[in-house]
């Protein structure tokens, strides 16, 4: 094993230990079984190479967003924001059980939430397309949201 692999394994062990400590905090009120389930889902997401861009360079966690769009105040916290020279990706984690099978099954509330985030982030990164996706922790699976449907929800919310 080379030094880089050893360092990566050490980082993985530290991440898992930190997650265990966090979940075990009595203030969360999580039973042991729930802690194990959440930990397993979280580690599966982080270990899946398909999600590497969401957690790699250029990505940020828990990004607060606030703005006034078409006279309406929009605020929230983006779970992951990936900023690249040619695009921006907004990712929100969802834990629905079972997760929706298709875009048509995604609750309207999530569409509105992501449409609002997209409108706010679009004011900052107006020179780049802003994409949105939901990361379902069960599976795990990344579901990119259709821009046309996001646009429709933004119109319904009076954000355009």
Positions of PLM-derived features:
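Structural signature of nuclease core domains in nucleic-acid processing machines
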Residues: 1-160
